[in-house]
Amino acid sequence: MYQSMDLDDIKGHSHIINEDAEFDKTDSDNTFALELQKIIQQETNGGKVQDDVLAEAIATVDVDLPYLSNVSSPGLVYGTNKQSEHPQSHGGKDSDLTVEHILGDLQSGTEDDKEFTDRLNRLLCAPDSLKRGFSGDMEIDIPSNKKRKSVYETLSPPESMSPLSDKNDAQQNRDLNTHKDFSAMKRKINSQRMLKQVPLPPKLTNEFTMTQVAEMKKRVINTHKLILNFNFLKDGYARSCEELSKTVVKLKDSEFDRARLVKENQDLKRMVLEMSKQLNEKQ
């Protein structure tokens, strides 16, 4: 569609761009540049690239005037209306096209690269946080691996069916529970370390033992006294029981005597009545 152009022609017309990254309309030789800018704007608005020669010419103009474009995106000199934040003084076109100059501009870096390096340095200076994150990732990955292994073993045929199999269920269970065994062993080791580091409580000292012995002696003496008192009470109860039995016997004897006396009294009364009757009859 467009007429092919040589790179030397584009370089020859690069001097018509002023300091504001725009074409100098006062120059009489800027007709080619204005037409080129219109063509580029039309192509960019349409979103299609029609000719490779045109893109190569744009890239050449961008390299010829690097201080008017961004180093990270060559070929966009037509869309820039601002100068770069860090302009550099160039001695001439030949010095701008040298390899050292281009590499120096590329190695200058951008703000994104600086932010990335700062973040990387901060991460390197904080190994504990990285370790914690790594351990958390490992804890998340281990159960998932165990789940995959258990699912695989449930789906796979039993190995005991084959005559050449040497594995058994105990070995499989041991392989599956390696993480649990390791965690239990780790807790046991940590508990032993804590027991060694913690000082002995006051209950396990010699003073506490002596006080416990003295209290035990007092308890033994008090128990012996209680036993003696119990024996004394038992003897007194036995004596009171004997006396009670004796009194009961005496009470029985007294009752017998009273009954005998009552009977004698009745006999005497009867005898008195008989004698009084006889006396009355004689008179």
From Swiss-Prot:
Disulfide bonds: none annotated. It comes from Kluyveromyces lactis (strain ATCC 8585 / CBS 2359 / DSM 70799 / NBRC 1267 / NRRL Y-1140 / WM37). Residues 148-174 are annotated as: Disordered. Transmembrane segments: none annotated. One of its GO terms (cellular component) is cytoplasm. This is Protein ATC1/LIC4. Residues 157-174 have a biased composition (Polar residues). Keywords: Cytoplasm, Nucleus. The lineage of its organism: Eukaryota, Fungi, Dikarya, Ascomycota, Saccharomycotina. Involved in cation homeostasis and in the regulation of the cation stress signaling cascades. Its main location: cytoplasm.
